[in-house]
C-alpha cells in the first residue's frame, strides 16, 4: 500500500467500499490518461521518445511514477508500427526517477493500428476533395496520429483479445445515421455503408493477473464537435460509447463482429473495466443527449465511485467563464478546456463491471501547493485511476 501514498496526497480519493475481513490477495490500480501526444508530424513522438529529454514526456513519467498504475491506457499517443514506443518510454523516461520519484517499468504492453489518419478514399467531409485529414476513417494527418497504447505490469493474453477497428457503423442496429436539417442523409448510401464506427479503435484486452482474469475495454471516441447541424461527430461519439454497452450486455451483442471475424460480446460474468477518454460529460458540454449515460446507467456497470480532485474544483472556481454555467460538480472534471467556450469537463472514465471489489478512485489534479501541481500542464486532460481487489 505504501506505493500509493504519494499519489493519494495529490488527489482526493473516493472510498467506495470497505474492505472485508477476507481480503483478496491482490489489489491493482487501473488508469486512463489522454496525454495529448498526438503530434503534428509523423515521427515527432518517436524522436521525443528517443531523445530522453522531452519536457512533456518527463512530466508524463513523473505523473506515472506518482500515481503508479498497474494497467494504463494512454490516449492520443501516436502509433507507429516500426517504433518501440513502450520500450523507449520505459528506458528513457520511466526508468529514470523524475524529481526524486522512484523509477518504474511496464513489462507488458499492447498496441495496434487505429483508424485515425488512415485514408478512406472517400470525400467524407464533402469539400469536393479526397485525401484530407477529415477524409480519414478517423480525423488525422497521418496513419496512427492520436493512437492508443496500453502499458501493464501483467501479461495480455493476445490470443484471447479482440479488436474492432473495422466494424461498420451501419452494422449497428438503430445506428444514429447523421441527417441534414431537411431530413436527407448527410452521408450518401455508398459512403454510409463503408464508414467504420471507431474513430480510433475498440480493444477488448484479456489480462492474466496472477491467474485471475480481467478484461480492459479500451477506446477513445471522436469529440462530439467540429461538425454542423447534421451532428455527425456527436452521433458517432454516441454510438462508439453505445458499442461497449451492447458488447457488455448479454442480450445486445449478437450483431458485433470483431476484426478476426468472431461474433458476439464479452462472456456473461466476465469481469471488465471500460477505460478511455469518452469525450462525453454526463451533464455539460456538447455531446449527444444521454451519450455517456448509456454506460453510467447500465445495471451491470458500477459507476458509483466518482473520481474527484481538489485541483478540478479549484480550476473551475478560478477560471470561471463557461464553468459558471455548468451543472456538474467541478471536482469531478478531468479536462481543462477553454474557459470562454466549453469550460472544464468530465470526459475520462474507468468504469468497472458490477461485482468487482472497488477500493477507491481519483483524478490526478493536485491543487496549487499540493505535490505534482506543476506536472498537470503536460496535457489538457488528467489521469483518472480506479483501485480494485481481485
Language-model features and meaning:
Residues 16-148, 176-194, 210-214, 227-229, ...:
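N-terminal, active-site-proximal structural segment of metallo-dependent hydrolase catalytic domains
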Amino acid at each position: 500500500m505504501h506505493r500509493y501514498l504519494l499519489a493519494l496526497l495529490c488527489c482526493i480519493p473516493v472510498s467506495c467500499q470497505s474492505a472485508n475481513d477476507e481480503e483478496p490477495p491482490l489489489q491493482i490500480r487501473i488508469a486512463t490518461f489522454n496525454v495529448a501526444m498526438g503530434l503534428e508530424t509523423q515521427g515527432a513522438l518517436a524522436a521525443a521518445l528517443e531523445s530522453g529529454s522531452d519536457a512533456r514526456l518527463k512530466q508524463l513519467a513523473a505523473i506515472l511514477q506518482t500515481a503508479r498504475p498497474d494497467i494504463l491506457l494512454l490516449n492520443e499517443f501516436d502509433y507507429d508500427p516500426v517504433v518501440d514506443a513502450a520500450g523507449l518510454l520505459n528506458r528513457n523516461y520511466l526508468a529514470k526517477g523524475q524529481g526524486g520519484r522512484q523509477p518504474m517499468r511496464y513489462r507488458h504492453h499492447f498496441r495496434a493500428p487505429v483508424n485515425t489518419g488512415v485514408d478512406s478514399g472517400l470525400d467524407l467531409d464533402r469539400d469536393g476533395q479526397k485525401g484530407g485529414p477529415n477524409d480519414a476513417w478517423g480525423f488525422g494527418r497521418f496513419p496512427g496520429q492520436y493512437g492508443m497504447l496500453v502499458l501493464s505490469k501483467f501479461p495480455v493474453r493476445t490470443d484471447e483479445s479482440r479488436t474492432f477497428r473495422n466494424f461498420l457503423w451501419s452494422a449497428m442496429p438503430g445506428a444514429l445515421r447523421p441527417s441534414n436539417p431537411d431530413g436527407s442523409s448527410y452521408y450518401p448510401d455508398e459512403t454510409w455503408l463503408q464508414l467504420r464506427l471507431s474513430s480510433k479503435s475498440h480493444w477488448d484486452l484479456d489480462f492474466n493477473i496472477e491467474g485471475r482474469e480481467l478484461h480492459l475495454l479500451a477506446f477513445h471516441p471522436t469529440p462530439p464537435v467540429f461538425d454542423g447541424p447534421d451532428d455527425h461527430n456527436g452521433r458517432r461519439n454516441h454510438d462508439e460509447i453505445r458499442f461497449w454497452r451492447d458488447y457488455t450486455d448479454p442480450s445486445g451483442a449478437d450483431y458485433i463482429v470483431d476484426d478476426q471475424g468472431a461474433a458476439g460480446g464479452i462472456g456473461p460474468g466476465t469481469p471488465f473495466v471500460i477505460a478511455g477518454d469518452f469525450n462525453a460529460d454526463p451533464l455539460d458540454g456538447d455531446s449527444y443527449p444521454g451519450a455517456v449515460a448509456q454506460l453510467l446507467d447500465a445495471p451491470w456497470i458500477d459507476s458509483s465511485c466518482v473520481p474527484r480532485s481538489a485541483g478540478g474544483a479549484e480550476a473551475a472556481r478560478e477560471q470561471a467563464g463557461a464553468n459558471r454555467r455548468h451543472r456538474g460538480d467541478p471536482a469531478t472534471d478531468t479536462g481543462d478546456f477553454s474557459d470562454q467556450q466549453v469550460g472544464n469537463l468530465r470526459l475520462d472514465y474507468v468504469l468497472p463491471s458490477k461485482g468487482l471489489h472497488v477500493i477507491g478512485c481519483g483524478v490526478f489534479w493536485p491543487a496549487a501547493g499540493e505535490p505534482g501541481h506543476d506536472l498537470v500542464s503536460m496535457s489538457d486532460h488528467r489521469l483518472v485511476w480506479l483501485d480494485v481487489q481481485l
